Amino acid sequence: MSRIDSCCIIDDDEFFAFNTKKLMKQIGFCENVLWYADGQEAIDSLVGLLIENIPLPEIIFLDLNMPNKDGWAFLEEFQNIPKHQRENVKVYIVSSFVSPENMAKAHNYASVTAYLVKPLTAESLEKVA
């Protein structure tokens, strides 16, 4: 049984997204996984969900380095969504390396819960759930 009803991966790395979705289903972490290749596609889709009165995913796994709209730009726009519609969403930044500068910057965003290192594993997802 899934622990999370819905989550979202925002990352331009198709290989990472595919493997993470597969892992999530294998361990029963989440059944409904949305994937967006850049921040603009994600913000447009999430706003569309709200327009249709569909709640936002409970968890967002966000890469920082993407074309079009990167993770930081996504976070800026995400803050424009009314607080009552986003306050239960946990954002986890996912990155291939830990940058002290990025970790410090992430603390400026109330929605950011933690900074995770790629690839995500069953153990790292257990800590999220």
Which sequence ranges carry the predicted segments?
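Conserved acidic segment of CheY-like receiver
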Residues: 5-15, 20-24
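Helix N-cap/capping motif at the beta->alpha junctions
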Residues: 35-48, 71
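His-Asp phosphorelay/catalytic-motif detector in bacterial-type signaling
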Residues: 55-59, 84-90
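Active-site residues of response regulator receiver
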Residues: 63
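Receiver (REC) domain active-site loop signature in two-component systems and cognate sites
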Residues: 66
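Alpha4 helix (beta4-alpha4-beta5 surface) of REC/receiver domains from two-component response regulators
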Residues: 73, 86-89, 97-114
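A Lys-centered signature of the CheY-like receiver
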Residues: 117-118
